[in-house]
Amino acid sequence: MAMLPVAQLYRRDVPALHTPEGADLLQVLWCPFDHQAMPRTTLFWRSAATVSDILNTPPEPPAMRSDGYLPEPCLLNPEQVTEYPDHLELSKERREQLGAWSEWQAAVTDVDDYASSPELFYDRELAAAPGWKVGGWPRWGATDPTPRLCPACGSDMDALLTIATFEGDDDRSWLPNEVREDREHTGPSSRHTGPEGQAVIDFFRAQGIEVHDRGRVPRDARVAPLGTNPAPRQPTAVQIGSGYDQQLYVCPAAPEHPHSELMH
């Protein structure tokens, strides 16, 4: 069975992409059938100068497990953002700081819905960004954090690429520009930090945690429901399981070592 193209990333476009020596291009392909509940991926590290005979339209497979395994072609517009690990990956001391709800109330307005679960506010509003991304942290929930060790040398593996079903959810601060622009009320630019956002930043800095505002959308840009067009939330038409992410990991010591993948 021929494998399908999933992503093609150039180092010139994605500075965070750590490639092996002599390579500046990553091509990700997968089998359009399940292997342990998700498509099996293959990585090709290449030199862009050696790529020729480019197909404008890749061939479609004669059969596949799901239509969600056939990505829609998309032109990437990458943006660098700062995100943080899920609360389950934090130290006990940091988790205790997150549980101090009175401090959250003093720093942020309109957050009473999270009073019983302060860590949920952190995970949704500040931690790992949803959507397709290079590097970054996983968004745990379906499973608890799992060790990611290189099968060849035992080194801790680094996140390479997240293949996501959705680019954003209705209840998260992280939104792609297309979704924000599709709202009935757009509000200020995502690069502007209002009083609420600055209060969150000040709160974390007081705990000795450096915080950046890039990638967050002010609350008044999130008041309207998502538009009727689902494409901004799912531009690639990819679906992993019932709406999960598939994250690929590589060995930082030797990217040519076998990679691993997790669904979460």
What are these regions (language model features)?
Residues 1-264:
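Preference for intrinsically disordered or flexible, low-complexity segments
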